[in-house]
Amino acid sequence: MALNLKINRQIRAPKVRLIGSSGEQLGILNTKDALDLAREADLDLVEVASNSEPPVCKIMDYGKYRYDLTKKEKDSKKAQHQVRIKEVKLKPNIDEGDFSTKLKQARAFIEKGNKVKITCMFRGRELAYPEHGHRVVQKMSQGLEDIGFMESEPKLNGRSLICVMAPGTVKTKKKQDKINAQDEKQ
């Protein structure tokens, strides 16, 4: 985070519009007088608006101001949750034990709040029977429908059948669709 604010002796303007530490307007003063007021209050003189005439300066604790800004920035980064897309790869002729392992893996991803991309890969002549892949993907989505919903229907893309599951329930998806429909009307 780069703060390009001038403080104390870095302020070169002859006169400044001064704002006190509690936010009250103190008027236009010589920079030297403003610095003396800030020093008396044991605070810093910070130039907050350099593009106005005369520049606007505020009496504040600059170290605390920077600390608060960095803390707010960190808190806002923590609040953001980046949804990642995890992938689970299957084959159309997957065995039951392997399928249950992949289902547990996909369930863990969704419970952590990630989306899951289910990919059923066809090899050789398996592409002649895409219904086998559809059946495996459908079985996987049914196993996850209590904690997630199918965000995109299964699509054949080259030699792969792909669909995306998102965390939440069908009710959540219906609510989101309803909100989107209302937004489109407006």
From Swiss-Prot:
UniProt GO cellular component terms: cytosol; membrane
GO terms for MF: ribosome binding; translation initiation factor activity
Compartment list: Cytoplasm
Entry keyword annotation includes Membrane: no
Record's keyword terms, sorted: Cytoplasm, Initiation factor, Protein biosynthesis
Gene Ontology BP term (one): ribosome disassembly
Subunit record text: Monomer.
Protein name: Translation initiation factor IF-3
